[in-house]
Amino acid sequence: MTTETRLEADSIGTMEVPAEAYYGVQALRAKQNFPITGTKLHPVFIRNLAQIKKAAAITNNNAGLLPEDKADAIVKACDEVIAGKLAEEFIVDAIQGGAGTSANMNMNEVIANRAGEILGCPKGSYKMVHPNDHVNMAQSTNNVIPTAGKLTVLDLLAPLEKALVRLEKELAKKAEEFDDVITMGRTQLQDAVPIRLGQVFHGYVSMVSRDRKRIEKAHREMYTVNLGGTAVGTAINVSDSYFYKIVPNLEKLTGYPLKQAEDLFDATENLDGFVAVSGVVKTCAVDLSKMCNDLRLMSSGPKTGFGEINLPAKQNGSSIMPGKVNPVIPEVVSQVAFHIVGHDTTITMAAEAGQLELNAFEPVVFCNLFESITTLEKAVDTLSVNCITGITANRKHCKDLMESSAGIATALCPHIGYKASATIAKTAVKTGKSVRELVLEQGIMTEKELEEVLDPYLMTEVGEERKEDEARRKAC
């Protein structure tokens, strides 16, 4: 079956473009030039780029530079793109040369052809609405692409933040549920001193809360845009009316508190804002992976590992070992973290590679940053739903571990000194006897004294909790 085509020309030459396509010659060239990932532009990025084109059409019309009929047609075409109706027309690869020019022209061509069609012109004629003269009026790739990237980051961060709020709540529930479960804390994988399992999970709550707040602060990096600066920040070919109104008009469309950069040269040259956002996303991923390492260790076994907690069984763990269940959810979260660390390195190197008045590597920055945010959001969701909510504690086993450990000898130090306590601990390890047994055998303390010194709850209480507990004891 032969596809009908139309001829389109650009400064490079003439090409045949599918007759029914809304994209044009420049998008088609880009598709042929950049068969890199097979991944197209992120749909949220496409939507935001269309928002910018819509704001530009409104602003240029208000400035008297774009006739009403053309502006209305462009706005209608933009609304269709925003609604996702022309998604298949965006054919360029996510990673492309040219600082995003291919993505910008793909959008310009689609909107021009659809707007022209609304006004009664055939696709490819560009007589009524031209991709450069009308759709791209007062704009440059060098400011619409980074602005679309910032809006997309803001849109993608919102569901990640919601996922983190949910994770924080689920961890808080476990912190409360396990508050009375005493186990042995470990430093450098060696027995240390007793700790409540609830305190362990409360530490995770604080960590996730801190990560969430960092991400909230990262929004500020994305609110400053360089629209109006055109190619290098000098605002060439931009009217005063457009220069001062484009950002407020875009702000109305998006609902974000956007502001035009005070230094448009800086905002056009540098990508440090994206590096900063990537950094906080990476930090969150690293923190969650560390927590997942803990969960895997604490649930290891069930007979020959730590065995302090049970993770919900989600699937068979082996094709050869019957009944084996693996900690698959913590494992996948850690893998996402590794992936994000790699993305962050790419983003860092791409930002560093900019030269003079522009960084040409925004496409790879966006491709990696968008994926980092979306994969982390999904990882956080599955961690909450498929792991944290179903964790249970092996209470008796935790207590046995604590009581059999020589680590509780630390509590003796204020009463019998470090040296004597160390001797008790070494003897306990060597003989297999408990610290409690040895202290009583050697007559170092009475059973009543020892009961108070080795009280696991007193050993794990902090600050005001300890004062309240001591007050209750005296009252009794």
Residues covered by each model-derived region:
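Conserved, well-structured ligand/cofactor-binding cores
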Residues: 1-476
